[in-house]
Amino acid sequence: MTSSPDITVSVQVHHLPAQSTPQRQLFAYFITIENNTDDSWKLLSRHWTITSGDGQQFTVEGEGVVGEQPLLAPGAQYTYNSFVTVDALPGRMEGHYVMGDAWGQTAQVPIPPFRLDIAPESGERLLN
């Protein structure tokens, strides 16, 4: 794997109280991936570590995101959303994407850690 290319990942998270219970809190998260390089990069896979407020931790890995493996041309953005539940607050998510270029090189692109809470940190989190 090569060093991380100049690909920016931004995250917004929203608590969904109407679909939550005291034992299981539901959150929607919105991810935007921006390719700031001069090359095209394809999102090959994802790796998430999700930690509940009680310390329970689990990992989610798989190909692409939401059933897609988007190809990001130079300057392009890709946005998707998904959902996660945690049993105890506050929770936390973090991880990385594995991206591939046209020459077969792969690179890990970090996903900034974000908090899962009823009153989440305000604003958008950015990571280069």
From Swiss-Prot:
Disulfide-bonded cysteines: none
Cited InterPro entries: ApaG_domain, ApaG_sf, Uncharacterised_ApaG
GO BP field: error-free translesion synthesis
SUPFAM superfamilies cross-referenced by the UniProt entry: ApaG-like
UniProt domain ApaG: residue ranges: 1-123
HAMAP family found in the cross-reference section: ApaG
Name of the protein in question: Protein ApaG
Protein's organism: Deinococcus radiodurans (strain ATCC 13939 / DSM 20539 / JCM 16871 / CCUG 27074 / LMG 4051 / NBRC 15346 / NCIMB 9279 / VKM B-1422 / R1)
